[in-house]
């Protein structure tokens, strides 16, 4: 890691993303503020725009090896464990093919300026091991790996938790009450030793899942989790949350990671993102590689055009909100005390002559506008 450097550029600085030109002091990878006192020969100058590190808060990277396999299939036909089309094909894929697909997926995220991502890693310890193998090829993006046990077994769950950042479950409907309680009980023991461990789960992704839960348990998925005293660190999707679901999430401080492009790819509807953003901490992800590119730029642009949420709020979802949800310390802003992990935007037509630079980043930037560069290759 570079111990001391000066970076001259224009920055989207602080939580309000104020456009600020100047020279940042960076010491041991941490932003110390701006300075006017320096020798020009000591300065690294970047003529584009420096923005906070982009974060993708929900992916399934293994299915990069089976892109577009399920065009016009229903969500259950595609991804419902254990017999969904995705799971059947991934079972047939060799480890080498899966690892190569993951490696290419990592390169794709890197080219899109994504510095961190959270992957729901299926196939137990094997799936985690394959992703870790692929990650050795790059310094960035860094992975938050949420493992998924192959079966509800104490030893299996513990082995997954030992080698991952937590658990990422497919949905409450896949488990009986006692199974959910066992999984969460084991998770809590690990969380007592490491508070950064995460427990996340898909919820209210499609109307059928909500109706199934209501018919079988007399409660929605969210209501059932809370009734079982299971409090996820976040839920994914929330496409069909009821008013009571929203109130329960709010009362229990449970964030939502929305994946709007994926929801429409699978034809399951749209989350009430404006309402969620007004009441909860909201992050964004891109979900399955088989259905979507992992581009957070595309996700932000799509969200703006569908919902007309303030561009500043959308950029927060992709940066500081995602960092908070994933418990990434001192990440997600260009600000004093934060890590010097940035996404670098070239001085291209996407941002030149902009009258609203945040809107231009959110709605115009694409892969070709990113410089594939990191200041902190050896970040811990």
From Swiss-Prot:
Q: Per its UniProt record, what InterPro entries does this chain match?
A: Amidohydro-rel (IPR006680), Metal-dep_hydrolase_composite (IPR011059), Metal_Hydrolase (IPR032466), MTA/SAH_deaminase (IPR050287)
Q: Where does the source fall among the domains of life?
A: Archaea
What GO molecular functions are on record for this protein? hydrolase activity, acting on carbon-nitrogen (but not peptide) bonds
Q: Report the SUPFAM superfamilies cross-referenced here.
A: Metallo-dependent hydrolases (SSF51556)
Known Pfam families for this protein?
Amidohydro_1
Q: Which CDD domains match?
A: archeal_chlorohydrolases
Q: Which family does it belong to?
A: Belongs to the metallo-dependent hydrolases superfamily.
Q: What is this protein called?
A: Uncharacterized protein MJ0699
Organism of origin is Methanocaldococcus jannaschii (strain ATCC 43067 / DSM 2661 / JAL-1 / JCM 10045 / NBRC 100440) (Methanococcus jannaschii)
């Amino acid at each position: 890691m570079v111990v001391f450097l000066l970076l001259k550029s224009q920055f989207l600085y602080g939580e309000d993303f104020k456009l600020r030109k100047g020279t940042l002091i960076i010491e041991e990878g941490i932003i110390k503020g701006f300075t006017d006192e320096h020798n020009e020969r000591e300065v690294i100058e970047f003529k584009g725009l420096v923005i906070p590190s982009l974060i993708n808060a929900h992916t399934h990277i293994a299915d990069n090896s089976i892109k577009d396999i399920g065009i016009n299939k229903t969500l259950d036909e595609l991804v419902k464990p254990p017999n969904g089309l995705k799971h059947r094909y991934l079972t047939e894929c060799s480890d080498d093919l899966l690892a190569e697909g993951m490696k290419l997926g990592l390169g794709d995220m890197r080219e899109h300026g994504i510095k961190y991502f959270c992957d729901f890693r299926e196939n137990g310890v094997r799936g985690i091991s394959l992703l870790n193998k692929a990650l050795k090829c790059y310094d960035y993006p860094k992975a938050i790996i949420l493992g998924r046990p192959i079966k509800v077994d104490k030893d299996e769950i513990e082995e997954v938790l030992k080698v991952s950042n937590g658990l990422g479950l497919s949905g409450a409907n896949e488990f009986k009450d006692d199974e959910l309680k066992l999984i969460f009980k084991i998770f809590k023991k690990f969380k007592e030793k490491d508070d950064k461990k995460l427990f996340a789960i898909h919820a209210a992704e499609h109307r059928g899942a909500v109706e199934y839960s209501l018919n079988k348990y007399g409660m929605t998925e969210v209501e059932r989790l809370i009734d079982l005293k299971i409090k996820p660190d976040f839920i994914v999707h929330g496409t069909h949350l009821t008013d009571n679901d929203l109130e329960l999430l709010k009362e229990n401080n449970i964030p939502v990671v929305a994946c709007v492009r994926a929801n429409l790819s699978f034809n399951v509807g749209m989350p009430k993102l404006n309402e969620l953003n007004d009441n909860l901490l909201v992050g964004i992800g891109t979900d399955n590689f088989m259905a979507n590119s992992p581009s957070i730029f595309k996700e932000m642009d799509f969200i703006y055009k569908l919902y007309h949420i303030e561009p500043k709020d959308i950029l927060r979802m992709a940066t500081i909100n995602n960092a908070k949800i994933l418990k990434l310390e001192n990440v997600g802003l260009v600000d004093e005390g934060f890590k010097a992990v940035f996404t670098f935007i070239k001085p291209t037509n996407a941002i030149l002559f902009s009258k609203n630079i945040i809107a231009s980043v959110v709605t115009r930037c694409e892969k070709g506008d990113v410089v594939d560069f990191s200041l902190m290759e050896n970040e811990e």
